[in-house]
Every structure is written in structure tokens, then in C-alpha cells.
């Protein structure tokens, strides 16, 4: 029985095939704050020679203020509305690698656009690793609570069932960022190969007159 694990082929050898099979789609990284979407996304984009965008950075450019200031001044609902406009606009620049904010994929309209025009990749990290990482940036709006760890656990409970709708899930807490980026690329190539095989099998079945 053949393994479903992506083969460890050098990235340089699968790059051109991946870009051809990607067919003008976006690679969209989703997951909670602190999983490393931006850092890993930049590395993926560099290895594949694709443009990289961070939706939070693009939101700050559009609003001319920080995410923290946006939350404080206009509230979360206004931030989410701007987030949707920015991400849907960024998706027009395909192919690209896009790192999204933790709540973006929860938005149904964003989720539909990602599934229509991209491949969604959930970067998953355990709670302790997350808390260790987010503690380095104490200004995160959603963690301005008396018990940030409890808040993070609630976010996991709320968001994980929706994150699970992603095309791919990559557990990234045990690997360094470069290795995770390489794992993402290999998993995307494996996904595209499977997608192509499924199309070929479907086409063969449709043309079968036996």
C-alpha cells in the first residue's frame, strides 16, 4: 500500500511542477495568532518565487493605523469588515502566498473566496507553544484579558472546527520555521498531485463505455 505522506523531494525539483499545477491559485495560511503564518509564509514565497502578503500589514496600510488602534477606535466588527475587503482584494493578485489574521478564515465570505481561488493551509501549534510565542507580543487585542491562556483555549474551541475545513493541516510546533515551510510546499505538491489524479480518474470513468 502506498504511503500518503509527501515524498521528501528537494524543493528546487518540485517548484516548477507545483507552480504549473497551482493554476493561478493562492496559497493561504490560516491559524491562530502565534503559529508563525507570516514568517513561514515569507519563506514559502521566497522558495517558490511568489509574492507574499500579510493581511494584517495590508489592513494597517489601508487604515493608516495599527491593528490595536483599529480595535480600540472602531471595535472588532469594523475591523472584520475592513479585513474582508482587504483580503478579497488581495486574492485578485493570484498567484501569491497570503498569511491571514487568526479570525479571517472564520468569515464565511473570506472562506468561500479562499476555497474558490486558493489552497488553504492550517498551521497548527499546541497551546503551550502558542502562549510562549504570543507572550512576546503583549499588545494583541484579543488577549487583553485577565487570563490570556483561558482566552486562547476559548479561541481554540471556537475556531478549530472551522479551521479543520482547510485543504491541508500542518502541525508545526515541533519543527523549525524553515522545515515547516518545506513541509507545506511538499504537502501542497502532494495535494495537487492527488487533485490531478482524481480529475484523470473522473475523466476516464466518464469516457468508459464498457
Curated annotation (Swiss-Prot):
Binds 1 Mg(2+) ion per subunit. InterPro entries: P-loop_NTPase (IPR027417), Shikimate/glucono_kinase (IPR031322), Shikimate_kinase/TSH1 (IPR000623). The keyword RNA-binding does not apply. This is Shikimate kinase. Catalyzes the specific phosphorylation of the 3-hydroxyl group of shikimic acid using ATP as a cosubstrate. Substrate binds at residues 56, 80, 102, 159. It comes from the Bacteria. One of its GO terms (cellular component) is cytosol. It comes from Bartonella henselae (strain ATCC 49882 / DSM 28221 / CCUG 30454 / Houston 1) (Rochalimaea henselae). NCBIfam families: PRK13946.1.
Amino acid at each position: 500500500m502506498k504511503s500518503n505522506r509527501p515524498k521528501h523531494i528537494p524543493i528546487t525539483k518540485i517548484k516548477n511542477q507545483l507552480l504549473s499545477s497551482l493554476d493561478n491559485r493562492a496559497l493561504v495560511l490560516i491559524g491562530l495568532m502565534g503559529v508563525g503564518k507570516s514568517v513561514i509564509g515569507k519563506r514559502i514565497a521566497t522558495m517558490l518565487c511568489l509574492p507574499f502578503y500579510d493581511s494584517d500589514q495590508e489592513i494597517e496600510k489601508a487604515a493608516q493605523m495599527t491593528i490595536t488602534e483599529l480595535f480600540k477606535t472602531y471595535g472588532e466588527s469594523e475591523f472584520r469588515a475592513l479585513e474582508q475587503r482587504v483580503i478579497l482584494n488581495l486574492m485578485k493578485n493570484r498567484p501569491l502566498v497570503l498569511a491571514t489574521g487568526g479570525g479571517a478564515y472564520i468569515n464565511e465570505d473570506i472562506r468561500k473566496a479562499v476555497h474558490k481561488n486558493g489552497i488553504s493551509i492550517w498551521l497548527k501549534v499546541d497551546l503551550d507553544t502558542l502562549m510562549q510565542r504570543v507572550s512576546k507580543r503583549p499588545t494583541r487585542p484579543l488577549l487583553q484579558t485577565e487570563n490570556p491562556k483561558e482566552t486562547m483555549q476559548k479561541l481554540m474551541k471556537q475556531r478549530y472546527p472551522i479551521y479543520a475545513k482547510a485543504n491541508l493541516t500542518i502541525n508545526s510546533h515541533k519543527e523549525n520555521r524553515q522545515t515547516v515551510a518545506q513541509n507545506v510546499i511538499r504537502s501542497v505538491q502532494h495535494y495537487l498531485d492527488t487533485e490531478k489524479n482524481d480529475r484523470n480518474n473522473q475523466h476516464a470513468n466518464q469516457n468508459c463505455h464498457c
